Amino acid sequence: MDSDLSPQDKKDLDKFIKFFALKTVQVIVQARLGEKISTCSSSSPTGSDWFNLAIKDIPEVTHEAKKALAGQLPGIGRSMCVEISLKTSEGDSMELETWCLEMNEKCDKDIKVSYTVYNRLSLLLKSLLAITRVTPAYKLSRQQGHDYVILYRIYFGDVQLTGLGEGFQTVRVGIVGTPIGTITLSCAYRTNLALVSSRQFERTGPIMGIIIDHFVERPFTNMAHTHPCSYRAPGEDDGGTYAGIEDSQEVCTTSFSTSPPSQLYSSRLSYQTPPLGTVDLCHPTACTGAAHPHQMVVPGKDGGIPQVPAQPNHGTGAEQGRIPSCPTGQPPQLPPPTSCSSEVKTVSPSDVLETTFTRKVGAFVNKATTQVTTTGLDLPFAAFAPRSYDMEENDPMVHPPPSPIPSSPLQGSLHSNNSSHSGGQPNDDFVMVDFKPAFSKDDLLPMDLGTFYREFQNPPQLASLSIDVSAQSMAEDLDSLPEKLAVYEKNIDEFDAFVDTLQ
């Protein structure tokens, strides 16, 4: 297929595909770091600014991508995939999405490699920047912390979608035709985010206590003094890797410093569709009993039935939070790489208190006192305001001043009835303000805009169009008609002579 390409075009196309694959991995992984990325444009781009985009490469990600490619390029039958997964503090994992860069046999031999293919790959990369921030995994990555982390894995070969569970959806980011094939970039993401723990069928007590129903007593009250689990030891370097994780599966480096606990509680999984809410791991024996109006049973991938409550009820947040914990001296057990589970949402009591406090912050929580001084007000012209006043008694909007008496009957007739009586009613909805607008020509007729509009909207009827006047004039014409006809008959010869002159 590439026999028609010149050596230079073939070299350029291979280079474009190679760097596009590397930039694709960078965009996907950086979108799952859990933090917003802001880059500044530059008038003098450097050699690393491929496809006219200022994407700063992470060396570890580039190393993993090159190791996965192993000198190969995505081609026909050879796909490069980036798998995004979630791992909880208890060792449960769940695949979230798989991004696939592949090529099919459909060729576009008339396309120019140096300009057209390069520019279209740039547009496809920009589309990828947008699509990576609208899939469900983006919201999860923004909330990662001590409860779970987001992992990625790069592999080269056949696409593996079995770990996404049933009902996963696919989206095509875009396609770019080349002389050797059509490059296709697509994504398959999980829609069922219910978590099934690998240890939920054990007879030992659960590591974390979750409230199944806020109308029932709190279970596991002795768990309030436990501490959250963590993959990293306290003295471990930030640049280290998690224990038990393969070298090809990197951990986002900012997974533990991006979201405070209060944000984890308030906005966890807010991206989901209305029937799905935050996913909680329930007790094995309590999962069968079920359901509260704010909860929903969602079958897990392995047959489990986790509880999926909707949004937390106001006033019950302190009863629903628990700290994920693990037994002393026992490290978290890691499941096999092929096991799939979903995210566990837990919060500490301090998170609930902080969330409750932030909900009370507002402009209308406490009723303002009646007496207000100018020192407590943020007035733009505080120097011109009175020293002290009462809001209810002296407020001109509540008790408007009486309207001045019109200086002339004509001026008084132009005021509406509602405005003329506004001075005697302290609770009127309208306040009459007398002023002289620019469209009022004389000082004797100062009218507001509403009066001005109403006067011209309903003008008085013309006297010539009056019914009485028109009827009277018609009767007079009928009475004088015989006299006019007699005059015309008398002068008929003159009219005939005038008509002859016109011919």
Curated annotation (Swiss-Prot):
Phosphorylated under nutrient-rich conditions; dephosphorylated during starvation or following treatment with rapamycin. It comes from the Eukaryota. Pfam families: ATG13. Residues 300-345, 392-428 are annotated as: Disordered. Residues 408-425 have a biased composition (Low complexity). Residues 329-338, 398-407 have a biased composition (Pro residues). One of its GO terms (biological process) is regulation of autophagy. Its main location: cytoplasm. InterPro entries: ATG13, Atg13_N, HORMA_dom_sf. Keywords: Autophagy, Cytoplasm. GO terms for molecular function: protein kinase regulator activity. It is found in: Cytoplasm, Cytosol; Preautophagosomal structure. GO terms for cellular component: Atg1/ULK1 kinase complex; autophagosome; cytosol; phagophore assembly site. Belongs to the ATG13 family. Metazoan subfamily. PANTHER family: AUTOPHAGY-RELATED PROTEIN 13 (PTHR13430:SF4), PTHR13430. Autophagy factor required for autophagosome formation. Target of the TOR kinase signaling pathway that regulates autophagy through the control of the phosphorylation status of ATG13 and ULK1, and the regulation of the ATG13-ULK1-RB1CC1 complex. This is Autophagy-related protein 13. It comes from Danio rerio. The gene is atg13.
